[in-house]
Amino acid sequence: IISVHLYGQSGNMEDILKIAQKYDIPVIEDAAQAHGSTYKQKKIGSLGKVSCFSFYPTKGLGAFGDGGMIVTSDEEVNVRARMLRDYGRTGRYDHKIIGFNSRLDTVQAVVLSAKLKYLDEWNKMRNDAGRYYCNILKDVKGLIAPKMKENQTHTFQTFAVRILKNRDIVIEKMKEKGVGVLIHYPIPVHLQEAYKDAGYKKGDLPVSEQMADEILSLPMFPHITKEQIEYVCDCLKVIVKG
C-alpha cells in the first residue's frame, strides 16, 4: 500500500496501517512533499515499512540539483536498497546484483545539511501561510480550500484549491493579474500513457479525474507575506465570482 502524503498533509495512516496489518501488506510512505509533517505527533516517514523523500529543488527540503532518500525499519530492505543505489555492490568491486547509480553526491549532501537546520522554521512559516490562505478562502463560493486535519501538521509544500468551474479561464485571468498558478497534477495516474497496459479508460476513476480537472496551486513559499497572500486571494475571489 502506497500512502501519498500529497502537498504536505498526511494520509489517514491509522486506517491504512490497520488494513496493512490485517492482510500483511507492507506500507510505503510517499513523503516526497511532507518533510517534517506529522500524524498524531509522529513524523511522516516513520510509520511505514519504507518511506521515500524527494530532495528536488522545489521541495520543502530541496537540494541544489536533484536527489532523494529512502528510509526503512527493515534490515533486509536496507541492505538491498544500499546495493541497488550503488551498482549492486556490497563492497569495492563486489557486485551481487544489477543496480543503479543512485547515490546522493557530496555537493547535494552539503547543501541539504546546511538547509536542514532551517526546515522546522520554514515549515512553520508555510503552515502559517497556509492557515492564512484557508481563513480568507474558506467561505468563497466557486472554490474549495484545503481543510486542516486535527492531530496533523500540514507543511503546505503546495497550496492547492479546487476551482469548481472554468478553471482554465481562471488560470489565464490570474496570470493577467501577475499571479503565477500551476496545476498539480493535470493527468490522473490511471490515464498516464505509461500505465495504458493496465486497461484503464476515462471515467473509470471519476473522483480522481474530477480532482485533476479542478485542482489549482496558488503561490506558496516560506517567506510569502500576508500582503502577497491577500493580493492572490483578492484576485481569485473576483475572478471566481465573475
Q: Where are the regions a protein language model picked out?
A:
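A conserved catalytic-core signature of glycosyltransferases
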Residues: G65-D66, V107
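PLP-dependent aminotransferase class I/II
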Residues: I1-V4, Q9, M13-D15, K22, ...
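Short glycine-enriched loop/turn motifs at secondary-structure junctions
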Residues: L61-G65, Q152-T155
